[in-house]
Amino acid sequence: MKDFSDFFRNPHIWDREIVAVGGDLSPERLLYAYKNGIFPWSDQPILWYCLDPRGIFDLNKLHISKRLKRKINQKRYTITFNRAFEQVMRCCAYRPGEETWITDLFIKSYTEFHKLGYAHSIEVWDENGNLGGGVYGVAIGNFFAGESMFSFISDFGKIGLFHLFEALKKDQFTLFDTQQLNIVTLCLGAYQIPKKEYLRRLESAVASGKKWNPLRTVF
């Protein structure tokens, strides 16, 4: 792996959230960043963050409401992995009237990262074959960073997240990074831990460096 230690501040000792400004979103830089607890946000210029505290999920403690559980059990949908990665990213970026950090540069760069086996999507299709929801993120070793989620059909994004968690647990993932908390992730059970603890857990989770290879359709 290419060494970018001269570009990024060391998050173990740097006490600010922005650890670098500029650079590019090349696969090599993204891989180094995620393995060291760093992620990009915005692209004019690119700002690289390592937040303290850090938002994470416990894979065994996703909060599922009774209403959502009924929808999951009704199975009026089809789940796939990595069938429509770029489409999922574009759907996550589609926020009429709002700004989005998922720009064309991010879409192009993460799609390339996906082709190399590090970025993944989960798609939730309705009974007519329409893409109703999905999630995308980055997987390295036993670590997954959830980047964004969308729902064009009510709760389909949450259904996708539920099945993503099931797949990650099956493959023995140990850390799910949600970066920062928002009202959706809070309601689903995300919580914060100190950066120091996050980096310790991350080091163990990414140690194998293996690529995740989920089946295209597993449910």
From Swiss-Prot:
Organism of origin: Leptospira borgpetersenii serovar Hardjo-bovis (strain JB197)
Pfam families: Leu_Phe_trans
Gene encoding the protein: aat
Enzyme class: transferase
Functional note: Functions in the N-end rule pathway of protein degradation where it conjugates Leu, Phe and, less efficiently, Met from aminoacyl-tRNAs to the N-termini of proteins containing an N-terminal arginine or lysine.
Name assigned to this protein: Leucyl/phenylalanyl-tRNA--protein transferase
GO cellular component: cytoplasm
TM stretches of this protein: none
Primary localization class, coarse: cytoplasm
GO molecular function (one): leucyl-tRNA--protein transferase activity
Family of the protein in this entry: Belongs to the L/F-transferase family.
One of the protein's GO biological processes: protein catabolic process
Subcellular location: Cytoplasm
